[in-house]
Structure formats: structure tokens, C-alpha cells
Amino acid sequence: MTPPTTYTAMEPCQVWSWDITWLPSTVRGRWFYLYMIIDLYSRKITGYEVHETESGEEAAALMQRSVLHEGCWRQPLVLHADNGAAMKSQTLQMKLYELNITASHSRPRVSNDNAYAGSLFRTLKYVPQWPSSGFRTLEDARHWVDKFTRWYNEEHRHSGIRYVTPGERHRGEDSVLLKQRDTLYRQAQKAHPERWSGQTRNWQPQGSVTLNPEREKQAA
């Protein structure tokens, strides 16, 4: 039986996506490797580490720590990644089996099949605090990523989830926050209708999130 090629997240910790990106050092030709996991439903960073090497062993250890931290140990979870060596390593695949995680991989020759992780890395590398000259040490890189992750999860108002933070959506706080925001906008429109040319912004909570939904069209 052919395994499914698209998955839908109705709540947090159902579908994760992950990738590895290079972080430059101040030494020419030397890089650090950022492993990072994002929850598709909430956009929360659910796991991350920075290492000096790229390996399936480091990835497997990160996955175990992440599911323990998020409290989804042995619960059904899909983990999407591209087709890199670390992502398809036997060590990682064995760990995913142990953790009851279903592996999903990008289609060959499709560049945007891991779009959520790619978008996260673009945000990371274009924030004003990004050290364009590189990181001096591994500890410097880890410290910077720690600060970025706290900002991204708890302060960054994400356009893809109605401008709440990933942490708020992950904890289920977005419904109340968006209802309050909708009420505020409607009151403002009622008080000054001349300032509004149409309906207020849609503040309904973002619904389910589907991984690569265009695949469904191809299968139809």
C-alpha cells in the first residue's frame, strides 16, 4: 500500500517539519549546523540544537528530547523533512519507529516541499539581530539561537496564524485573543464607520493546516 503523501494537523503535535541549516562562523570555511523543528499547526519551534556536525545521531537525540519536552511521547506524530543524509539516516529512522513517529519526505525534484521549515529559516536569517559576520564560537551560536527561539515563540506575531504568537496558538490561547481583537475592531467600526470601507479584518482562528495540499490535487 502506498503511504499517504499529505497530512493535516488539527491541533498541535500532530505534524512537525524539520530541517538543518548552516550558520556561518567568523572563520572562513567553518560552519555550525542548526537543527530545528516547527509544529505545522501552531508554528511553534518545538525543538532545536546547534552542533559542529550534521548527523543522524544528533537528529535522533533531538527528536527524543523534543517529544519528551512537548509531552507527545509515543503519540501519533508525523515528521516531515527533505531527503538529506541526516534526515534519511538509519539511526534516525530507527528512533522515529521507536517513538511512533511517521516519517514523511519531500518529493524528488520539488524544491518547496518543506516550505514551513524553509520559511522559518528565512525569518531567522533576516531578523535585524542576525550576525552577518558570523558566530565566533559554538556557544555564541547556541546563545543566539536560544534568544531567537524565545522571541519567535513568544513575541513574534505570525501572519500565518492571524498575528498571534506561535506559543499562544500552541497553548490554545488564540481563540480568546482573536475574539477580543474581533470585538475591538467591530466596536471601532461602529464608533467611526466613515473610517471603514468594508468589513473588518477576519479574526477567526486559523483552522487546520495541511502539509503540501497540492498533492491531493495530483492524486485526484
What are these regions (language model features)?
Residues M1-A220:
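Charged DNA-binding/catalytic regions of mobile-element recombinases
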